[in-house]
Amino acid sequence: MLAEKLQINSITPHPSVEYWSVCKVEALFETPFLELVYRATQVHRKHFNPRAIQLSTLMSIKTGGCPEDCSYCPQSARYHTGVQNQQLLDVDEIVAKAKIAKARGAGRFCMGAAWRGPKPKDIEKVTEIIKAVKSLGLETCGTFGLLQDGMAEDLKEAGLDYYNHNLDTAPEHYAEVIGTRRFDDRLSTLGKVRKAGLKVCCGGIVGMNETRKERAGLIASLANLDPQPESVPINQLVKVEGTPLADAEELDWTEFVRTIAVARITMPKSYVRLSAGRSGMTEEMQAMCFMAGANSIFYGDKLLVTDNPEEDGDQLLMAKLDLEPETAENKKL
């Protein structure tokens, strides 16, 4: 099964990396809820300071007009969602936003461009942007789509730290969500990213009418990447009018928390990011996610083109929960 053997480079699997079959991951999902969260908390505390939360800001630097048909995405040119197309922004505008993000406590600045994949001329400008943002002392992450040969090396040379390229969903569910690319296309780009020496940010979306077994398949696919991703964003579907998944069945909040917990247990050393969908989550649900091992959030009122909790609200929630922004000093217990 594809989800069970997903090496993204030629490195021999490290003996300390546990192999996760879909059945084994599914069994984790079926663990009694509080027991599962408790186990995830124990794993989390072995590798991270449970009070430290990595704050990241995500900015859309090229918006809309994407030729892909991802059923969840309001930036697809195939759907009428009201998103206004915007060409690649100027360096100065992006740097100004990055400075604001840093002043507000973000340690990581993520940039997203709605392309199937960048062209060589796009990479020239993107590398200029990365250099400028990196000079501010921020960690940098980019999500620009499928990469051609040599592009990952160019991004690395410019100073990019992480490349985000999500698997989105389980291999078995992939064709139900996306028809313009294959699951293997994602793995190919991830391989190029690893070969270039970049860190990998790779996660998925839940709540897209997948079954629990397919959620287990997504987590197994991520956990069996070799090496495991340094950063794993777990997104809850944001239903946008005009997209095919606008009427997707609502996912129970406990199932989302289970997904966070299972991600933490199977990928103990990865950052598990509580990503899209937080604006629809209660404070109590977010608190359970942090208890279950989430230790990173996107900080700012927008995630590309969808809403995110306001920064003041996040600061208040973190204060209520006695959480603090991650720094080099408080990273570990």
Curated annotation (Swiss-Prot):
Location of the Radical SAM core domain: 51-278
Catalytic activity: (4R,5S)-dethiobiotin + (sulfur carrier)-SH + 2 reduced [2Fe-2S]-[ferredoxin] + 2 S-adenosyl-L-methionine = (sulfur carrier)-H + biotin + 2 5'-deoxyadenosine + 2 L-methionine + 2 oxidized [2Fe-2S]-[ferredoxin]
Essential cofactor(s): [4Fe-4S] cluster; [2Fe-2S] cluster
GO biological process, one term: biotin biosynthetic process
Keyword Iron-sulfur in annotation: yes
Main enzyme class: transferase
Residues that, per the record, bind [2Fe-2S] cluster: 110, 141, 201, 273
Binding residue positions for [4Fe-4S] cluster: 66, 70, 73
EC code: 2.8.1.6
Pathway(s) this gene product operates in, as recorded in its UniProt entry: Cofactor biosynthesis; biotin biosynthesis; biotin from 7,8-diaminononanoate: step 2/2
CDD domains listed in its UniProt record: Radical_SAM (cd01335)
Recorded family membership: Belongs to the radical SAM superfamily. Biotin synthase family.
Cited NCBIfam families: bioB
Protein known as: Biotin synthase
Source organism (scientific name): Haemophilus influenzae (strain ATCC 51907 / DSM 11121 / KW20 / Rd)
